[in-house]
Amino acid sequence: MQEIMKAIEESAIKIKHLIETGDTGKSEFENSTGDTQLKLDIASDKIIEDIFKNIPSIKAIVSEEQEAIVNLHENGKYLIAYDPLDGSSLVDVNLSVGSIFGIYENEFNAQNIVASVYVVFGPRVEMVVTTTDVKMYRLLDGKFTFIQNIKLNEKGKLNAPGSTQNCWAPFHKQLIDDIFNDGYRLRYSGGMVPDLHQILLKGGGLFSYPGTSDKPKGKLRQLFEVFPFALAYEKAGGQAVDGFKRVLEVQTTHIHDTTPCFFGSNSEINRVLEVYKKNV
């Protein structure tokens, strides 16, 4: 596992340089879900794949930017699903973006996730590693240095409501309105990584990306985005649910499956579960 962490650190330093100097324009290609790929997406993906190819403990990888699993080392122990540059469309307006890694054993599903890592590329570069606990590192003088352990409070103050609002179910809209009426502050940039990172560092709150009329199964991808952050939130003392159960109990049938998801401290997630139980 240690060599995987070092590989992610190496990729993060290279992607940092790419963000600072690379072309932010669109490519002529689409990814597996039909989104037009930015040149930064393709370049970031290649950086990570090229580094992972040299790690004997990695059996296979799959990128959000690619359709299929890439087999690497037959005797490897770990499978890695990753989003090379989540929120890449925010780079050209100079907002924070990130990379997300889910590390699995045996097969790609929630029950087999053993660790996760995400990297935030903002004014500073920070890396959060989740195994049995949640540790944050910061890039200082070219090296990642341990800063702190992360723990959530029982109740937070931030609300980050995602997806297209005119496609929300009425009860979901009422839930979000009620949370704001209770004094929560809006914190939503459109980047999953910095928004979830902020809630973790500020002690708690709610990030929601529900099923909607146009996307009943949600938009965020299980293996690449949802499960890695679910592990982080649970190990930090919070919860991650799909509205009814832990997202780490969700079954994956295809590597690019999506799911509705809610991440937060216990008070907010219990509120979500209560509302969804009554209305669905």
UniProtKB/Swiss-Prot annotation:
User: Which reaction equations make up its catalytic activity?
Assistant: beta-D-fructose 1,6-bisphosphate + H2O = beta-D-fructose 6-phosphate + phosphate
Identify the CDD domains for this entry: FBPase (cd00354)
Give me the comment on cofactor binding: Binds 2 magnesium ions per subunit.
One Pfam family, short name: FBPase
Q: Which cofactor does it need?
A: Mg(2+)
Give, as in the UniProt entry, the pathway in which the protein acts. Carbohydrate biosynthesis; gluconeogenesis
Keywords attached to this Swiss-Prot or TrEMBL record, sorted alphabetically, are: Carbohydrate metabolism, Cytoplasm, Hydrolase, Magnesium, Metal-binding
Can you tell me which family this protein belongs to? Belongs to the FBPase class 1 family.
Name-wise, this protein is Fructose-1,6-bisphosphatase class 1
Please give the organism: Aliarcobacter butzleri (strain RM4018) (Arcobacter butzleri)
